[in-house]
């Protein structure tokens, strides 16, 4: 499926907590006593007012942590609803145009350009990926779905295959992350030992650093949001 096996590539975005704030009433959220001194940056605060209810709604529908979704949006588009990448991905969650067919089949969305549908499509995609990594647990599982959202499920599956061939746990992000560089064409001799066809099933992959940074950035945002938002 195109929606699951293709990914998107985005520049890194830093998150700085610079302004102490109470949470928007629209979210129905409260800061727990132990997190009273945690501060949200102004960009996140403003975006929560605009999109918080949609993020919460579709995260609840598809059983995802809304703070993780918030972290993904921060990394993907910096909360810009009209963001467009050089690959054609668009919106808050940077949905690729070729995902439209599956969107129609799975959730009945005719377009994913509006903030509502873009968020819905993105959260649905995250949940779909979540099901593919049921043997990973905790943060490993989260990191797998983030990597697949960025690089495509197929590439992460290929990296898992290499990790397994090398005798490592294919459900540990630590080892799969280390296997991503080995998807480069320069390791063709290794590929011949892993796959009968002699190369990764989703093709060669040379931009592993971007995917690793992508995952690390979102995990940091997610950690910060879990402290600041309840």
What residue spans do the PLM features occupy?
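Catalytic and substrate-binding regions of cell-wall glycan-acting enzymes that process beta-1,4-linked
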Residues: 25-26, 145-226
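N-terminal export signals and maturation junctions of secreted/periplasmic proteins
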Residues: 3-57, 81, 228
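Extracytoplasmic
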Residues: 50, 64-69, 74, 87-90, ...
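Substrate-binding/active-site groove segments that recognize
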Residues: 86-107, 117-126, 218
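Short, functionally critical alpha-helical segments immediately adjacent to catalytic or ligand/cofactor-binding
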Residues: 63-80, 122-123, 145-151, 218
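Secretory-pathway/luminal and periplasmic proteins that interact with or process carbohydrate-rich
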Residues: 77-86, 129-132, 151-165
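Short glycine/serine- and small hydrophobic-enriched flexible loop segments
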Residues: 57-60, 124-131, 220
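Second-shell loop/turn segments in exported
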Residues: 38-45, 55-60, 81-89, 105-116, ...
């Amino acid at each position: 499926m195109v929606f699951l096996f293709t990914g998107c590539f985005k520049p890194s975005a830093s998150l700085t907590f610079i302004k102490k704030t109470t949470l928007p009433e629209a979210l129905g959220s409260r800061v727990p006593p132990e997190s009273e001194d945690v501060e949200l940056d102004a960009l996140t605060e403003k975006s929560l007012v605009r999109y918080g209810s949609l993020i919460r709604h579709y995260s609840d529908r598809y059983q995802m942590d809304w703070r993780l979704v918030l972290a993904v949006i921060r990394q993907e588009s910096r909360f810009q609803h009209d963001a467009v990448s050089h690959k054609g991905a668009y919106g808050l969650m940077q949905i690729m145009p070729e995902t439209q067919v599956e969107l129609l089949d799975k959730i009945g969305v005719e377009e994913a350009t509006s903030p509502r549908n873009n968020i819905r499509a993105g959260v649905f995609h995250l949940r779909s990926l979540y099901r593919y990594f049921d043997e990973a647990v905790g943060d490993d599982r989260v990191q797998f779905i983030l990597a697949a959202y960025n690089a495509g499920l197929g590439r992460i599956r290929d990296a898992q295959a290499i990790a397994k061939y090398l005798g490592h746990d294919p459900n540990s992000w630590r080892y799969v992350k280390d296997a991503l560089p080995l998807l480069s064409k320069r390791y063709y001799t290794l590929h011949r030992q892993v796959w009968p066809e002699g190369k990764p099933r989703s093709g060669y992959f040379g931009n592993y650093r971007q995917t690793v940074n992508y995952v690390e950035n979102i995990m940091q945002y997610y950690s910060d949001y879990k402290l600041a938002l309840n």
